[in-house]
Amino acid sequence: MRAKIISVVANNFYVHLYDLKIQIKAIPKGIFKHNSHELKPMVGDDVEVELIGNTYLITKIYERYNQLIRPKVANIDIVLIVVSIVQPDLNTLSLNKYLAFYEARNIKNVLIGLSKYDLANNHLKQKINKLILDYKKNNYAVFILTKENDILLLKEKIKSKTLCLAGNSGVGKSTLINKLDPSIQQRTQEISHFLNRGKHTTTSTKLISFANGFLVDTPGFGNLEVNLTKNEMANAFNDFANYARFCKFSNCLHIEEPECAIKKAVDEKLIVNWRYDDYLKIIKELPNDVLKIKTRAQNRKCK
């Protein structure tokens, strides 16, 4: 039977059986416990489960199409980065760090959700609308979370997918979750009871049934902190991709190198200035070729 690992609690694995639409406890086959085995079961894995006697056994792990180490989760279909326009103010540098990280980790659908748009004044809304157009030109889907039509479009986008919500506290993630699936509160209580833990004691990653798919529930997405190399960062801005291959040097970091196609594209207004400026700020943070992203840092704000 095909299943998905939804939680690991004290070396106990809980899986969702696709066909039966139930959740059961399962034990990994002994081979997965050996240090020599490449794959170790983790939350998000699609697995094969067999009932042997009275025990469900995980006998196979299907190939992952992506995975994160911190938080530890595999096979993410969509990441929705939620940022507020006011209270707190929109921070494009923080947002671009999120975007770069998930692009670098092979997550194909990274979406942007803007909350509290209705609280912005007209002057700020004009700037935000220009910002939205710039992101859309770079093939990012942007949703204004206070607009009912955008919520409907987002519901359709996430249907039957494994979704992660990223973003700092206070930006409206909880409100959004209830808008996307009003039954989530009851289901969260059911899952907490199944896993025998309180709803306020989440210390590890788990998946909750959500919008005919799954929602990643983890403490690790609120304050992203990861390591990226300079070369990874240089390749993580998707608006650079069409131009970077024309750089003179294959390892060009697009800072001061001669014959850099990215700098030329910025001069020709093919890449927007503020995105490139944010890129320079990000990559110049890199000591010894490593970037430690801290999304709570004080960075550029759109006012």
Swiss-Prot record:
Cofactor: Zn(2+)
GO annotation terms (biological process): ribosomal small subunit biogenesis
RNA-binding as UniProt keyword: yes
GO CC field: cytoplasm
Superkingdom classification of source: Bacteria
Residues that coordinate or bind GTP: 115-118, 167-175
MF annotations from Gene Ontology: GTP binding; GTPase activity; metal ion binding; rRNA binding
EC number(s) given by UniProt: 3.6.1.-
Localization (cell): Cytoplasm
Cofactor note: Binds 1 zinc ion per subunit.
Keywords: Cytoplasm, GTP-binding, Hydrolase, Metal-binding, Nucleotide-binding, Ribosome biogenesis, RNA-binding, rRNA-binding, Zinc
Annotated disulfide bonds: none
Assembly: Monomer. Associates with 30S ribosomal subunit, binds 16S rRNA.
Protein name: Small ribosomal subunit biogenesis GTPase RsgA
